[in-house]
């Protein structure tokens, strides 16, 4: 069950709450066990959600989760006892966003990296709901009225002591937007789209990403640095397979103080995001050193994008055996049965280079289609160096890659043949030397002959075939027997 928190002290929150009740098939109930001001009295239930109203602003509520899960003494429904004391999966605070940011729909998690002027405790971070934040941002983007931007914000304000994960879903940024019915309804729709969502990131198959990776950390990243509206971390949320937990913007890090002296707060950012990796915006060597001393890893946005949904143990193995992602490692479409079931070898350098010259995009597709991973150069744009194949009987391998690269060459050559030890490509092409011997002047006439047109020189017609020569190009490859004999890579220590 997802707990929706509406504040009567926030007109935008009430407005969103009205649309939530209008959009859903809610059952009205009564909880006499707690004051109306604290979420008691009338509350609402529908499949997957419970909605309660509180008098205080959200940021000053200590732990509203305690109010949810059905009310003791609720006699409005015979089935009420079935969900009494049900713990919410997470809290969704529907709220206004205030600022000079115009039409904006946002989501963020809460906490204070330093002082607590707007609720919660100082130096304390709440339990984040990165998976829910990712899903609600996706839903906000789908439902946002024309003209509204969508993104995430950094971690800020209270509450900090919620007993379950939480997030804010906000409508901003001033009175015209808070009273905008279309925008409030968009936020309500986005919140209802959270039905069935876990606080942590889950796959399309409903598995948490830590279950897939056999790792205690889901695909969550902690963010440090940058501005309040966190454009880099919004990109990660919206454009990658990863979710973002706590984000300490530059202003929050300024309030935090020296990283090494505040290791406990930095560790909270990881523990309460269920994350083990961080992306740091800008040069912050002291912060990076502290993060690594705490046993976590600093990665780049490129790393997050490149890894995508690949199994993390496989990524670790490939970064050890080939290269790191920041050094140029990129991934193909093949996923082996286990991290140890890979075979690392050199790419067919000359063949690959020529195929890239014929059609760079097709050559890249050929490598990606057959490989588990491969090294690159030129900022990851050009495959080069080593390649890892799956070591099994059914996955594509070196010979399949050679065949696909040879297929790319067919677009630029008359014939292409794969032999034992080489790919042989033949072409009949314009020969400037032969043309010069026939008296053809350099310039436009050369270009016409090279394009397949005849030219006339001193009254003589010279056809392209008259000044063409057959060329044979040999691109070395490993023979099939060499390919079959290549041993699998030994497991890393």
From Swiss-Prot:
Swiss-Prot/TrEMBL GO biological process terms: D-amino acid catabolic process
A Pfam family the protein falls into: tRNA_deacylase
Gene3D superfamilies the record matches: AF0625-like (3.40.630.50)
Cofactor: Zn(2+)
Keyword Metal-binding: yes
Residue segments, region Disordered: 22-44, 441-493
Cofactor binding comment, as recorded: Binds 2 Zn(2+) ions per subunit.
Catalytic activity: a D-aminoacyl-tRNA + H2O = a tRNA + a D-alpha-amino acid + H(+); glycyl-tRNA(Ala) + H2O = tRNA(Ala) + glycine + H(+)
EC number: 3.1.1.96
Keywords: Hydrolase, Metal-binding, Zinc
An MF annotation (GO) of this entry: D-aminoacyl-tRNA deacylase activity
Biased composition (Basic and acidic residues): 22-37
Family to which this protein belongs: Belongs to the DtdA deacylase family.
Protein's job: D-aminoacyl-tRNA deacylase with broad substrate specificity. By recycling D-aminoacyl-tRNA to D-amino acids and free tRNA molecules, this enzyme counteracts the toxicity associated with the formation of D-aminoacyl-tRNA entities in vivo.
Subunit details: Monomer.
The name this protein goes by in its record: D-aminoacyl-tRNA deacylase
Source species: Halorubrum lacusprofundi (strain ATCC 49239 / DSM 5036 / JCM 8891 / ACAM 34)
Taxonomic lineage of the native organism: Archaea, Methanobacteriati, Methanobacteriota, Stenosarchaea group, Halobacteria
């Amino acid at each position: 069950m997802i707990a929706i928190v509406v504040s009567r002290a926030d007109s935008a929150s009430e407005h969103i709450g009205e649309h939530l009740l209008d959009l859903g098939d809610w059952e009205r109930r009564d909880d006499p066990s707690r004051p109306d001001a604290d979420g008691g009295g009338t509350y609402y239930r529908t499949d997957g959600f419970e909605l309660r109203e509180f008098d205080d602003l959200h940021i000053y509520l200590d732990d509203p989760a305690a109010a949810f899960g059905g009310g003791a003494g609720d006699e409005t429904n015979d089935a009420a006892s079935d969900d009494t004391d049900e713990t919410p999966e997470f809290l969704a605070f529907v709220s206004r966003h205030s600022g000079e940011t115009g039409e904006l729909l946002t989501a963020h998690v809460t906490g204070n990296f330093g002082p607590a002027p707007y609720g919660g405790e100082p130096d304390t971070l709440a339990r984040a709901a990165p998976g829910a934040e990712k899903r609600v941002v996706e839903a906000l983007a789908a439902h946002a009225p024309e003209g509204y931007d969508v993104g995430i914000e950094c971690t800020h304000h209270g509450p900090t002591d919620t007993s379950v994960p939480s997030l804010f879903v906000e409508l901003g940024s001033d009175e015209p937007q808070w009273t905008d019915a279309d925008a409030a309804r968009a936020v309500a729709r986005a919140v209802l789209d959270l039905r069935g969502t876990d606080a942590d990131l889950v796959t399309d198959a409903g598995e948490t990403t830590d279950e897939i990776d056999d790792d205690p950390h889901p695909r969550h990243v902690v963010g440090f640095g940058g501005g309040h509206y966190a454009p880099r971390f919004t990109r990660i949320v919206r454009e990658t397979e990863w979710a973002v937990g706590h984000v300490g913007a530059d202003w929050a890090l300024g309030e935090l103080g020296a990283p090494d002296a505040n290791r406990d707060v930095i560790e909270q950012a990881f523990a309460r995001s269920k994350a083990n990796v961080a992306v740091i915006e800008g040069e912050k060597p002291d912060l990076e050193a502290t993060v690594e001393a705490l046993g976590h890893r600093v990665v780049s946005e490129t790393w997050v994008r490149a890894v995508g949904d690949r199994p993390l143990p496989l990524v670790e193995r490939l970064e050890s055996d080939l290269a790191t992602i920041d050094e140029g490692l990129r991934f193909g479409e093949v996923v082996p049965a286990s991290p140890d079931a890979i075979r690392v070898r050199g790419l067919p350098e000359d063949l690959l280079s020529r195929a890239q010259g014929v059609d760079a995009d097709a050559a890249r597709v050929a490598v990606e289609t057959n490989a588990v991973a491969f090294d690159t150069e030129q900022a990851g744009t050009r495959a080069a160096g080593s390649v890892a194949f799956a070591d099994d009987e059914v996955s594509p391998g070196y010979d399949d890659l050679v065949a696909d690269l040879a297929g790319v060459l067919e677009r630029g050559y008359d014939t292409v043949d794969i032999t034992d030890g080489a790919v042989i490509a033949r072409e009949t092409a314009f020969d400037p030397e032969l043309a010069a011997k026939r008296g053809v002047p350099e310039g436009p006439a050369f270009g016409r002959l090279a394009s397949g047109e005849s030219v006339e020189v001193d009254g003589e017609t010279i056809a392209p075939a008259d000044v063409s020569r057959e060329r044979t190009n040999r691109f070395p490859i490993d023979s099939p027997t060499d390919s079959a004999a290549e041993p699998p890579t030994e497991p890393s220590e």
